[in-house]
Amino acid sequence: MRPTLPLLVQTDFPAIRRRALDTLQVNLGYKCNQTCLHCHVNAGPNRTEMMDADTVQLVLDLLRERRLTTLDLTGGAPELNEHFRDLVRGARALGVRVIDRCNLTILSEPGQEGLAEFLAEQGVEVTASLPCYSPANVDRQRGDGVFERSITGLLALNIVRQQVPQVRAGLARQRSR
């Protein structure tokens, strides 16, 4: 492989300087309740690779030792990891801001009852994506019924937000290329 550092040294491109590490993004596993055609980790319902309890404890240890301020949870559907709630509780007990990259449909999956309330009680920030405003486009990309279930998930989060004042909920618009 060709070394790239000499190429950077000989350019007028501004130097890239790193700041102190404050955010840790953790993929809790590849299992997901959706089958998105565009998934960059090829997650899906048949994937079984999930972070184990020992590794979750290492994450909590790292958060504590490095005094990190933000834990960004992703997957697959991170909520499908059996240690998700313990990790969230542990991080929040350390005063760490937690972001859940949620696909919204997980909120209505069997076994996930009370998830919206849990996220609210823990003060978790939910970052969710919806690739398009069109039900047909979303369902074509993510699976039948995903658009409608996503809207239902947003409504559930909105209801919880109204009941628990400290919950912050936002919707970001992403432009497609």
Residue ranges and their predicted role:
Residues 2-75, 79-97, 102, 110:
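Conserved alpha-helical substructure of the radical SAM core
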Residues 81-177:
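Conserved AdoMet/S-adenosylmethionine-binding subsite of the radical SAM
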